[in-house]
Design a protein with these regions (language model features):
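Conserved active-site and cofactor/substrate-binding residues in soluble primary-metabolism enzymes
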Residues: 3, 11, 18, 43-50, ...
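Rossmann-fold NAD(P)-binding glycine/threonine-rich loop
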Residues: 48-58, 197-232
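Conserved small/polar residues in nucleotide/adenosyl-binding loops
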Residues: 267-274
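Glycine/serine-rich phosphate-binding loop and adjoining beta1-alpha1 elements at the start
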Residues: 1-102
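Long, C-terminal catalytic modules of enzymes
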Residues: 240-263
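Rossmann-like NAD(P)-binding element
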Residues: 157-202
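Glycine-rich phosphate/diphosphate-binding loop of Rossmann-like nucleotide-binding domains
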Residues: 85, 93-162, 171
Length: 278
């Protein structure tokens, strides 16, 4: 992955279309000459926007970036319908578990989280929503999203309250260690953990290792952790994105991705100087 990122930057691009801010971050860290010659970039994901805001706050961002993720044509469709469908498909493909009647905990009720919750309800799950954010710079706060989840018919509370009752836990926050060692120790025997956020740190994997006596892969993208307390937990895709990890994760439907990729392409002209012909 990083070999590919470096290869891209060594080609001295003038504009980049990023997914997660990895390319932009690496450029600022190791390719200052490339950064100086760049017109700008586009960022596709919620997690990437979070990283970019942190860079901007620290005055570390050296060129303009269009927040494609904030476009209606992106998050209303890709985040909600694409993620909602592909995450459920990834979980079912890996586990063949029955969703109907299950207590499924969705952590994060942004557009991805609400899309996941909507499809879970359609499959007959009892959906529980945990919102971890207190405020948001350009949208409703976590309190408002939690209230929205309640009005959408979901149970709403903290992960501490529901940790011992959930059958399946799906993180969709873009934040670090939202499911931690304390939560996992409380979970029921056979609980399933899946990450639908971005990087593989939404679930505290080191914490899971520390409370486990042993672990083994029992199916592709399905690891069984035998906990020291006598229970076991199922981790999908080794904590990586459950909807993208092959062979069980197939990603979003192509109809969704057509629109998602068309959006940053159409925005690239905003990063070009006026003297450049498109």
């Amino acid at each position: 992955y990083y070999t590919c990122l470096n290869n891209v930057l060594e080609s001295k691009p003038r504009i980049v279309i990023d997914d997660g801010c990895d390319l932009i971050f690496l450029a600022h860290k190791e390719y200052p000459d490339v950064v100086k010659s760049m017109y700008g970039a586009c960022e596709e994901t919620t997690t990437g926007i979070v990283r970019l805001r942190a860079m901007h706050k620290d005055k570390a961002l050296k060129f303009p970036v269009v927040a494609v993720n904030n476009a209606y044509s992106k998050y209303l469709f890709d985040n909600r319908y694409g993620t909602g469908q592909s995450v459920i498909e990834g979980i079912l493909s890996a586990t063949n578990t029955l969703i109907a009647g299950k207590n499924v905990v969705v952590i994060g009720y942004g557009w991805c989280g609400r899309g996941i919750a909507q499809r879970l309800k359609g499959l007959g799950a009892k959906v529980h929503v945990v919102e971890t954010s207190n405020s948001a710079p350009d949208g409703p706060s976590g309190y408002h999203r939690a209230l929205e989840a309640l009005y959408d018919g979901c149970w709403v509370g903290t992960l501490d309250e529901i940790a011992d009752k959930g059958d399946v836990f799906i993180s969709a926050t873009g934040n670090k260690h939202v499911i931690n060692e304390k939560h996992m120790n409380k979970m029921k025997d056979g609980a399933i953990l899946a990450n639908a956020g971005h990087f593989n740190n939404e679930i505290d994997l080191n914490g899971l290792e520390s409370i486990s006596a042993s672990s083994k892969e029992i199916l592709p993208n399905v690891d069984k952790y035998e906990l020291k307390n006598g229970k076991h937990i199922i981790l999908l895709s080794k904590g990586r994105l459950v909807n993208l990890s092959q062979p069980t994760g197939q990603g979003h439907p192509i109809e969704i991705m057509d629109a998602s990729f068309a959006t940053p392409v159409s925005y690239t002209h905003l990063t070009l100087p006026t003297k450049v012909e498109v």
